[in-house]
Amino acid sequence: MISGRVLYRPAGRRGVGPLPLAATTYALRRRSPSITALGQPRRLIRRWESTSGAVGSDNSGHIDTQPNESILFFDNIFPLKLSSVLLWRAWETNELLRRFNSASLSFLDPIGLVKRAIPESAPIKVTEIIPRLKEGGAYVKFTYPDSISPADIEDQLVKYHEKTPIKPWFNPFRTIKSRLVLGRPWLEDLYRLPKSRLKIEFVPAKNSEPPTELSQESLYSLFRRYGKISDITSQAPDSKVLPKFAYVDFVLVRDAILARNCIHGFVLQEEGSKSLTRLRLSYEQRVKAHHIWNWVTGHPRIVIPVIAAFLAAFTVAVFDPIREFFVKRQTSDILAFRKRGDDDAGLSALFTHRKDLIDSIQNNLLETVGTFIVVQGPRGSGGRELVMDQVLEGRRDVLVVDCRQVVEARGEAGTIRKLANQVGYRPVFSWANNLSSMVDLAIQSTTGVKAGFSENLESQVTKILQTTAEALKDVSLARRKRDKDANLTDDAYLEAHPERRPVIVIDNFLHKSEEKGIVYDKISDWASALVQANIAHVIFLTTDTSYSKPLSKALPDRVFHQITLGDLTPEVAKHFVVSQLETDEDADEKKNGASPAISERKLRRDLQELDECIDALGGRLTDLQVLARRLKVGQSPKKAVSDIIDQSASEILRMFLLTNKGAGSGDKKWSTEQAWYLIKQIASKESLRYNEVLLSDTFASSTTADASNAEAALESLANAELVTIKSHHGRPATIRAGKPVYQAAFNRLLDDAVVNARMDLAVLTELAKIEAKKIDKAEGELSVLGSLPSQPYQTADRVNYLLAKLQGSQEKIVAYEKEMAGLKKVLSEEA
């Protein structure tokens, strides 16, 4: 244990210590009584004045005491945070402390607090006050008579403070404390702010004597008088750090300040030890234990899923309302999809011809049918114009989803971004999934647990469509408050008011369905949910005749409302072209619903050829629009139609005949020979029987590996729009040109001798290879039969059959080669 008295307090050594504090610390001395000019002694007045800027005795940085002189430290004299203002602003210290010194001794004056903290009955004489702004206190040096000890003076002050607590104006919840300075305080101005933890270093009192490390019990006995201690930590026994040290953690910072200023430099002797130990105190930043962080890093299997769930919940709570707002905005923007141009001015004739179809669709939008509306027709048949410009003209709350842009996007991120743009879903962080995938992979490789940060394409598409569905429901119920049926439930109101539901138009449905079928499956399921919940009407626009398969899977128990669009009749096509050529003066007549009349006044003289040209061009809407544009620039009908046919022939030649990369972009399931076979046969017959084509050698026995499946080849050519397959009672029956102008384009290709000879040569070469394979097969079987030890009579019929087949194939090869020789001659002579 520690002895009850101070064993040793060394005197200050001159020239030792830190640099002077200059302007940051002031010593205040009491003035001595002076003599007046008349020789009479002046009445003693207790005033305090600032001394010079020297710190400590002889600028040593320490406070020296003489016999019968001691030091008290008063706490809570200055605001503790005042040092943060003054520490790096030494030029302001003079002005600030001058205010303190010049102020009256009121309760606001810190010097007045010191005076109030010392009772008048105390037998001491204050000789010097040294403020410590950084620590919020002050040293008070005093002298005392021989009849009393400093410890008795300390006890008297402690009792006085307990009986008469003095609370400064800046801290009314804590009283001023004073304690006797036992050690040798160090007046430093370093940037070391007070902390609640003190580091006590045990250094030798004399250079020759090793210090003694104090026990926790001794440290507690020594420091507890200054304030409540939360913990005492001794140095590890195996630590080789010198000097030895210990940590004392106080509950309050001001208690640590009081202990540090009173005990620093204190010399004592541990009970049972012969050597003296000096205590050197300093503030230490307490290292907080990272218990929470350690638990988090130690339990990744629990923490990572929780973080993922929190991020998901945060995303839903913050971003989903914003996304729903943008979806509603895009749905209600009736001008977003209705951007007409000059080419749409003559569609009234077409819409008059299809008025029954328009009325049928509009009637379905006014009823609770609970099924899809499907508008199917070849590309360029005007399905989009029919729906957007006539059926939905003037209707609010229409959302258009173009599947072409979605499925043609590159990568999953592009698909998500395009789908979000179609429905107005923003903000969308399509790039974040790639980053999440890398983070997920890194976590899984280190912890063995999949964090679930990344999402696949299916889940992201589902999330976008679900958010869109919620926004569409809000749109359907937006005008409910002003309706007489406002008291109905949501489901009952939606069922009772089909006219209030928004309309979803899904354009280019099943475009390139073989590439991203999952997108179409999700869109079909989403549309089915909207229809069954009476949230919206759904209209599908498609050119694919096999649309019923994915839609029946999504809505198996309903019959679709199907609208089939075909090519225009010659009369309607003629009206359409003429209406496109109308002048601006005739626009009012067209708006009033009058059917455009054909008169010599409105037609140019060369339009007499229009009937013949339209018969050659056909009734496909896009081709008629091209014809009208050419006529507007001054071309004659024959010249315009001839150019259109030539352009179509060049397109067919480039896409199907003269390259290995057809419409399938490297994944085609047909061969060039098969395409030419159809072109040549349709040019002469206009219509082919489906099964007849399947049985032809070019399709049934193709030598091209990717085109060996005849039905797949025909379906692929139909998807590429080279041909159109017509059905009868649900089965494929006939094959025709992909669009009417292709019929004329096929004939134009046959008129080209070089193209005809080159493609016929390719077909004959393939047919010769097919017959050669038949001969090889027959010869192989004859070789097996000839190797038998005896020739049984049962094999005679088989041998004769094989020989006849071999002979027939050989005759075909001879005929093919003879024809091929003529074709080669044409190729060598024609340019």
UniProtKB/Swiss-Prot annotation:
InterPro entries: Mt_escape_2_C, Nucleotide-bd_a/b_plait_sf, RBD_domain_sf, RRM_dom, Yme2_C, Yme2_RRM
Major localization class: mitochondrion
Stored Gene3D superfamilies: 3.30.70.330
Entry's Gene Ontology cellular component terms: mitochondrial inner membrane
SUPFAM superfamilies for this protein: RNA-binding domain, RBD
Annotated keywords: Membrane, Mitochondrion, Mitochondrion inner membrane, mRNA processing, RNA-binding, Transit peptide, Transmembrane, Transmembrane helix
CDD domains: RRM_Yme2p_like
Mitochondrial matrix side: 49-301
Domain RRM: 196-286
Biological process per Gene Ontology, one example term: mRNA processing
First and last residues of the transit peptide: 1-48
Subcellular location: Mitochondrion inner membrane
Membrane-spanning intervals of the chain: 302-322
Highest taxon, organism lineage: Eukaryota
Signal peptide start-end: none
Family from the record: Belongs to the YME2 family.
Role description: Plays a role in maintaining the mitochondrial genome and in controlling the mtDNA escape. Involved in the regulation of mtDNA nucleotide structure and number. May have a dispensable role in early maturation of pre-rRNA.
Official protein name in the record: Mitochondrial escape protein 2
Source species of the chain: Chaetomium globosum (strain ATCC 6205 / CBS 148.51 / DSM 1962 / NBRC 6347 / NRRL 1970) (Soil fungus)
Lineage: Eukaryota, Fungi, Dikarya, Ascomycota, Pezizomycotina
